[in-house]
Amino acid sequence: MEEPTTSELKLSDNVMNEISDMCITEYCKPNMSLMAQINELFPTEQSLTQLDSIIASVEGEIGELDNELAYLVETNANVSERGEEALKHAQDAMIELEKSIGSIRERTKSSDEIVREMTRDIKQLDIAKRNLTASITTLHHLHILLTGVESLGAWVDKKDYSSIARQLPAILNVLQLFDAYKESDQIANLSGQLDKLKASLTIQLAKDLKNAFQTGQLSDRITDMCRVAAALEGNVKENFVKWFIEQQLSEYVIIYADNEEGAWLDKVDDRYKWFVRKLTDFERAGLSNIFPADWHMGRRLTSEFCTVTRDILYRIMTRRRQDLDWKLLGHAIQHTKMFEALLTKRFPEKDGISFEKAIWSVFDTFLDVFINAQEKTLNEFLDTCASKIRSGEEKPSRESSTHAVPFPSSADMFLLLKKVITESSKLSSEPDALIRDVIGVVRVCLRGYATSCLVAFLPSLGSQQSGAANLFSLIREEIAYPRLTPDQQFLVCCILATADWCAETSIQLQEKLSQRIPGVDISQETEAFYSITNQSLQVLVQDVESTCDAALQSISKVNWTAVDCVGDESPFIGSMRAHLRQAVPLIRDMLSDRRKYFAHFCLKLATQLAHKFVGSLFRCRTISTHGAEQLLLDTHSLKTFLLSVPSIDSIINSKPPTAYVTSVNAALTKAEMILKVVMCSLETVDEFVEQYIKLLPASDAAEMQKVLEMKGVKRQEHSAVLNAYRLKIGASGSDPIQQSNSLTSRIGGALPTVGSAASVSEAFNAVVSMAADGLSDQAVTSSIDKLKRFERLVKRQL
């Protein structure tokens, strides 16, 4: 076989590294090339002189390697023989090991069989032991049962309740162990004997117990009798407990029966005192110690007393309901709560049973007496308040206060309501349920106060005159509108202050009640008070506004056609300024601590005056260009003055609110635009209409007709202008013009409805406007006919 060359050998990297380490000598360095080694040995020509010595050294090294190889070959010549011998020894050892394992396996099998036999024997012994133990136990129980039944018969005859109490529970428990053997004659016989003994014992025990308590012979023997009663099956214990409690409460049932005079609510504390004495005697006499502790005889006696008392009180209150009043009811409830607190302290809550509200709850059915009484009290309070206000006793005086203050009765009312709510929470065992009923009473009271004590005393402007006759008298005779006196103004401001305070307090009351009872709502009453503040403001506005009626009415009486030049402002502006300078500061002082209402007052006043001024302009007929210019100047003067009304004659000259400025500007800017339209030429209808739409884009045909009348345009020429206007704005040209509208439709939107807050002054202005519109060019006879028709319509309207 050809030996593999060195290049064919494939050795691992580790082997190659070891060989490399072994081959490194002084002249053998595998990691260097042959040329590098020669250059290292002979770096120069002069080093060639050492060639012989180096050759000798290399030959010496070769000889050492040969010797080493010869030694290795010699020492490893017999390696294969030793390996074969070692392999044979290993095989022999494996054979011996297999024999040993087989022997161990055989011995293990025999051991398992021995263990199974031993386990089977142990189980048989255990079964035998259990059977023997059960037999011995059964025999022992049977012995106990036999001797127990025999002894029990003797004890019953001797009335040895101590022994019976000790052994009877054990005998009964043992008998239960023989339930599976009741078919056995002996067990059935023993069970029958025991039943007869229990029946005899039950009758005898009940008789002896009652006799012992009736004769008062109390001893430890009674405790044994009670233990026997507890051990006996059936209702022996419960029947005796019921009899004992009835005996203890028999006197109470007679003394405080519902037909006895002492049973009425005014003496309810006597019945509670009686039971406290009875319970004290019960414990002092040691009765609580005679009965077993688990009977809780004191607690059960108290519970029965509460039940009996609750039934008696319900019957007597039902029978004498007409005699109930809430103070008597409150007296009884107060003593009942005190008694229940005493019971709760003596007998704390146990097993979910408590004496809290044990009797108290019976009164809840009759608390409508409290509700009715509070309704009566509050109604009387409201009547008293109204009487005081009417007599002047309640009215605040201008001398005592510089500004309006709430009526003292408003604070008294809320204090009374608070007292009612507090009382209700003390009376009912379910206070939330009663408070819900009380809230209804509170709401009625608030509404009653708002109506009878506030609204009823708001001055009614023009109350001396009413109906259509009054309206026509104002038109024909121009009767002066009645004004409020300073005291009446102060009263109105006080009513406003009272309503505002009541509204804010009602909100606070609702928040407090909602914390306790979610869903409480008295917002309607709050809104009623806020509505009164608005009505009060309206009365003040109408009063101050009426001072300017004469000045506004004078506008339509001026012959504006004859005005040929523009001068200073017209007299009516000065008149209005003088009246407002006199009236507004007084109202401001009266409402000094309620600035928001004064601001609202100014807004209403300025807005209504501005609209009235526009209405007065519409009633002017045939205004010349100079007349329109004069009115334009007057309008600017009026606007400037109205913007200064909130701070008129005030030390502090503050800027008016934005809403106020916007409202005044909007109303009087329209007046300026109307006057500018009046100044426009009507030579060309289309140009006039375009100018009208430009200046008054939000106008309508009815308003345009009034503007034409202001310009003095003849009525027969109105149709052409109005039709052009309708075509321009896209309306139908076939609609009838304003002059053909029925009188009924015209007054429907102008007259105030009955019961509204509109004043007679507003009605006057509306009537004058329509009278001027409809009667301007009519004959006297026709005017009278139309006025009669108009009067009939007004009567129906009012």
Swiss-Prot record:
Subcellular location as annotated: Golgi apparatus, trans-Golgi network membrane; Endosome membrane; Perikaryon; Cytoplasm, Perinuclear region
The keyword Cytoplasm is annotated on this UniProt entry: yes
Tissues in which the protein is found: Ubiquitously expressed, with particularly strong expression in neuronal cells. Specifically expressed in head and tail neurons and in the pharynx and ventral cord motor neurons.
Membrane topology: Peripheral membrane protein
Recorded phenotype for the gene knockout or disruption: Mutants are viable but display reduced brood size and enlarged lysosomes. Egg-laying defect, slow, but coordinated locomotion, and reduced levels of unprocessed and processed cargo in the motor neuron axon of the dorsal nerve cord.
Keywords associated with the record: Cytoplasm, Endosome, Golgi apparatus, Membrane
Entry GO terms, CC: cytosol; endosome membrane; GARP complex; perikaryon; perinuclear region of cytoplasm
Entries under Pfam families matching the protein: VPS53_C, Vps53_N
Biological process per Gene Ontology, one example term: negative regulation of dense core granule transport
Physiological role: Acts as a component of the GARP complex that is involved in retrograde transport from early and late endosomes to the trans-Golgi network (TGN). The GARP complex facilitates tethering as well as SNARE complex assembly at the Golgi. Plays a role in the trafficking of cargo to dense-core vesicles, probably through association with the EARP-interacting protein eipr-1. Important for neuronal function.
Family: Belongs to the VPS53 family.
Subunit structure of this chain's protein: Component of the Golgi-associated retrograde protein (GARP) complex, also called VFT (VPS fifty-three) complex, composed of vps-51, vps-52, vps-53 and vps-54. Within the complex interacts with vps-51, vps-52 and vps-54.
Name assigned to this protein: Vacuolar protein sorting-associated protein 53 homolog
Protein's organism: Caenorhabditis elegans
Name of the gene: vps-53
